């Protein structure tokens, strides 16, 4: 028969709870909706870029500068002039039309409302997100600040822009 050995060590809690609490002031950016980088056009509002270089420049700015800035400064609620809820009806409705094309299953009916936020800094690039509790869900990139009328940002002829990274990527995957 073997001899019983007593365990003299006290167990430590090694399991961490990574669940996000609604009471937590920290913001979380969830990339759950994969079409947020997809390009689409509705009337004068487009998420197409001129070319691959413009798209890459913008996505690097978003991931490397904008999102870290939002994480760091969100507790200030209304971080800056370019990070805020979208409350103007005409701007909201422009974005909703584009969101319905990019994410057709997101809004189950026309009465369902999203709380939309614009994230941006001093450049023309804006990320349009839905906010639920303390989670932001990017839904589209407004590369050209077309949701809001602006003399300084809206002067480019974006109707000719047709670069879509997902279309190019998917085409390359087929080869």
Curated annotation (Swiss-Prot):
- The annotated region (Disordered) lies at 1-21
Q: Where is the composition biased (Polar residues)?
A: 1-10
Q: What is this protein called?
A: Uncharacterized protein UU032
- UniProt source species: Ureaplasma parvum serovar 3 (strain ATCC 700970)
């Amino acid at each position: 028969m073997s001899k019983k050995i007593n365990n003299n060590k006290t167990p430590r809690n090694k399991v961490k709870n990574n669940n996000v609490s609604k009471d937590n002031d920290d913001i979380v950016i969830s990339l759950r909706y994969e079409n947020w980088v997809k390009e689409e056009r509705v009337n004068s509002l487009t998420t197409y870029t001129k070319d691959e270089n413009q798209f890459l420049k913008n996505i690097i700015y978003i991931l490397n500068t904008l999102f870290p800035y939002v994480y760091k400064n969100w507790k200030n609620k209304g971080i800056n002039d370019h990070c805020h809820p979208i409350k103007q009806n005409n701007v909201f409705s422009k974005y909703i039309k584009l969101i319905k094309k990019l994410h057709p299953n997101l809004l189950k009916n026309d009465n369902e409302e999203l709380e939309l936020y614009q994230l941006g800094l001093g450049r023309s690039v804006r990320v349009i997100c839905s906010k639920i509790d303390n989670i932001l869900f990017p839904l589209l990139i407004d590369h050209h600040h077309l949701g809001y009328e602006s003399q300084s940002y809206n002067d480019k002829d974006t109707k000719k822009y047709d670069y879509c990274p997902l279309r190019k990527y998917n085409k390359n995957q087929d080869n």
